[in-house]
Every structure is written in structure tokens, then in C-alpha cells.
Amino acid sequence: TRADALVIESTYGNRLHRTLADTFAEFATVLTTTLPRGNVIVPAFAVGRTQEVLHVLAALARAGRVPPLTVFVDSPLAKAATEITSRYAPILDRETRDLAQWQVAHPERMRLLFTETPEDSMRINGIRAGAVIVAASGMCEAGRVRHHLRHNLPREECAVVFTGFQARGTLGRALVDGAKEVRLFREPVPVRASVHTIGGLSAHADQSGLLGWLEGFQSPPARVFVVHGEREASAVVGNFID
């Protein structure tokens, strides 16, 4: 394949993802150790990522790798996107269809609840333990997840699980980088909850994936534009190309 110009992303150009098996194992460990005494907050993009997270939770529940789950999806957009996914279930692969049907048939293993109103969302904050709360936005810059963080970050019994990239300057990035205190609604909030990053679900290719794709070109492009990445990650990809 010959290209005059190539545009390539570099989001994870300087790192490798964990395997899917390792991702499932870490998620299961966080859920098993946290839920008896606290809640697990999962900031997630409403379209695509939330549905993937629900798939993983159902897979762990069906395999008996986690205790019975009560999962709240607290995002109107995520609710709508999940309903669309369910509406077109016949075109999904068999594994996904079977898993969705299993979850509906076994609410005692995974109870799935979608919030309808702001009042429903606020009621979740009264739960002290046993809740998995999946809410937008994925980088914690807006949305209902900020309210859940305000109520759960100060509690060492709770955990926050990130499944996607956190850009510099976002609340999510501050938490991933180990901030001891953040500001929410103009007030300081101490961070005592544990914070976990599970990279195996990312939609962005890691360094190995990017370089493997580049190897598919029989002739090098005349020009390559490295985009969509922080300076360090873009530089690593650029150096490999050179």
C-alpha cells in the first residue's frame, strides 16, 4: 500500500495496554475488595464505553468472579445509547447477545438500574456500600459523575475505576496522577478513595498496535503527521517512524 501522506494518532504511543485477561482480573479484584464496605465509581463515556463496561461486569458476574452486583447507570445519554444497543441486539455477536440475555434472567447476580431523573441520581448518594456507579463524563469534567465523586472520594472504603484516557488538565487526570485533594463545585474534596486505571478497554491502539499497523505499508509514506497525543507520546511515535 502506498500513501503520499499519513495521519496517525499517538494517544498511547509511549505505553502498552494490559491484556484483556489482566484487565478483567484487576476489575474483579477491585469489585470484590471494595463493595462489601464501599462503592465503586466508574467514570465512562456515555456512548460505547458504558456499554463495554456493562458487558465486562456481566461477564464477571456470570463467571462468579465477583459478588452479586448492583449497577447504576447514571447518565441519560448512556441510558439512551444502551437502549439503542438492546434494540439492535440481533446484529450483535452471539457472545454479547447471550451475555445480555443472561443478565436479564439473573438479576440476583447483576441488578442493572438506569436513573431517570436528577432525584433518582441524588438518591444513589445515600448508598454507603455495594453500589457500582457508572456515570458520565469519562474524564469527570461534567455530568453526574462529579456528584458521585464528591460523595465517595473522601471515603477510603470506596474506589474509582478509570477505563479510558484522561487528558491533561481534567479532573480525571488529576485523580490518576495521585492528587490528594481536588475541587468539586468550588469546594476542596479530599481524595481518600483508591484510584485504579484499567487500560485494556481503551479504544485507542497502544504502541505495539500503532507500530504493527504501520508495518502494513509496503512503501513508506512521503509524509507522516503524528497527531492526537501528548508531546511525549507523539515524540515516541515520531522517533519510531524516523
What are the functions of these language-model segments?
Residues R49, T70-R87:
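Short, conserved secondary-structure transition motifs
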Residues I41, V71, R223-V227:
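Short glycine-rich phosphate-binding loop at a beta-alpha junction
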